[in-house]
Amino acid sequence: MGFSETRAYSAWGAWSTWLTICLALANLLPVTAKSAADYFVDSLPGQPEGPLVKMHAGHIEINPETSGNFFFWHFANSHIADKPRTIVWLNGGPGCSSEDGALMEIGPYRVTDDHMLNRTDGSWDEFANLLFVDQPVGTGFSYVSTGAYVSELDEMTSQFVTFMEKWFELFPHYEKDDLYFAGESYAGQYIPYIARAILDRNKKESVQAQNRQWNLKGLLIGNGWISPRHQYLSYLPYAYREGIIQGGTDASLRVEATISKCMKKLNVEDTTGTIHIADCEDILQTIVDETHKGNRCINMYDIRLTDAYSACGMNWPPDLKNIEPYLRYKNVTEALHINSDKQTGWTECSGAVGGNFRALKSKPSVELLPRLLEEGLPILLFSGQKDLICNHMGTEDMIKDMKWSGGTGFELSPGVWAPRQDWTFEGDSAGFYQQARNLTYVLFYNASHMVPFDYPRRTRDMLDKFIGVDITDIGGNPADSRIGGEKGPTTSVGGHPNSTTAAEREKEKMKSAAWKAYYKSGEVALIVVAIAAIIWGVFIWRSRRQKLRNSSHEYRGIYPMLGSSSSGSLPRFSNKRGRSADDVEAADFDETELDERLSRAVSSRSSREHEPYAIGEEDGSDREGEGSDERRGLVDKS
């Protein structure tokens, strides 16, 4: 092996050693976390013509010890009003998927019989971003290790706050939006607990120091399971009013017997343990059983309908038969970034989640509402008139007994209650409004347990009023909505407003957030690059030093133009005093020798000053042409 080959082999050996060290150090660094781009949904099977609503979907880990992951589906707003808003929607159960809300209630699309998607007229994404979350763990597309299900409301709340913190890390440009929580049924327990946790979180010094408070602006709960005591005791009065059960009959006596058992249980229970009481659950079941005729029974979610016994409403709404197969298609789950290794198929409601979530140690959320209202948080409760399971009479009785801000129920002053104001929408009698001291109640006539399923346009009008959207300065076709005969703020349901100024503000906000995200995501890469640069620098320094020790060629590091043999360069330094080579960096020669050699080289160059300068010379025409090629290449790549 020759000297040059030995030197090359030595250099490669050194380089490979340092490369191995660099890779080992890189492996010690944490794996780069997912970015928002990893959750982007660029298309959906069956999507309608035209641009798809901007959306992101996928899993976020909230408990690594139990493999607990929440699934979310986020839809960006279609237009911006005066400011950006985000609405988090939760379905109930417990254990029922929020994809019900996304595809049957307030989301931008609904699934047709042939599994196509149709745009919903009156969807809530017109002026607000929508975030649907499958929770607790194990619900819908969310997953968790077997046996690690949540059983109490404080556990659920803690996991949900963790999810929100991680979600805002992925999507920081939404963190300062006005934030609302909405949902129905058992979400009447979830939402007040989450709201309480957010308000408490905002008071922490660590959160305030980082300016990471969340702008919680209001809650909307439809047909909510908020006060179990009031709901249990409202079943028979509601059944009497709606003609489901006739008073003085054997059927009514059987129902009254179950109520007596429930009352005994309620009278011995303390504040906690009253969210789920088996003896009280029997009241609803007895009423439903009394409607059993042939193979049919009443639909407990919409008393205008019947269902096969013993489903009695579990097969409703009719869109469910389209949604379940659609959400199980492989190309749909792939588009939504579902982890196929952990989630085998979408189910509307999980028996395992519901069976474990008994909240036996949790107090009912009705006890949280007064303080939330007193702290200035607006709350809107709405009910569908034809729902039995979470009927409006139970909600109204709860409000009547609730005390907050120095009054009881909707008292304006002692003995004076806020009036019920008739609500008409597009010429039809839609229901009534009642409001006092931060609480609003809306009853929807002829509506079921899932009011947005029946009336998407009316619920959108209700939403826009509650969150303060006024299209007067935005544009769009106003909806004819009147409360107590007054039009109030102008809303636009299903219109196409123009909001250029607000859109520009949102664009700038997202641009700023994007830069912050880039800086954050680049931290790990920057560390790796810095380590690699240091190692590479050390390697180059050592290689050059070794080269100077072993090279038989002249040193060109001080005056490069004197090192060209073609133009009278310095003669190579010869071995002296037993040295194999002169080490310039180590000053392995005396100054007199260097002066003599430089003097001879300069004299030699002076005698040939008439020769053309050739060191590093480039042909200008070739350089210009090369630049042109590079520019053409850039154009091609773009």
UniProtKB/Swiss-Prot annotation:
Cytoplasmic compartment spans: 542-638
In the UniProt record, what gene is named as encoding this protein?
A: KEX1
The organism encoding this protein is Blastomyces gilchristii (strain SLH14081)
Q: Name one Pfam family in it.
A: Peptidase_S10
Q: What range does the record give for the signal peptide?
A: 1-33
Q: How does the UniProt record describe the way this protein sits in the membrane?
A: Single-pass type I membrane protein
Q: What does this protein do?
A: Protease with a carboxypeptidase B-like function involved in the C-terminal processing of the lysine and arginine residues from protein precursors. Promotes cell fusion and is involved in the programmed cell death.
Molecular function via GO: serine-type carboxypeptidase activity
Lumenal compartment ranges equal 34-520
Residue segments, region Disordered: 477-507, 567-638
Descriptive protein name: Pheromone-processing carboxypeptidase KEX1
Show the InterPro entries listed in the entry: AB_hydrolase_fold (IPR029058), Peptidase_S10 (IPR001563)
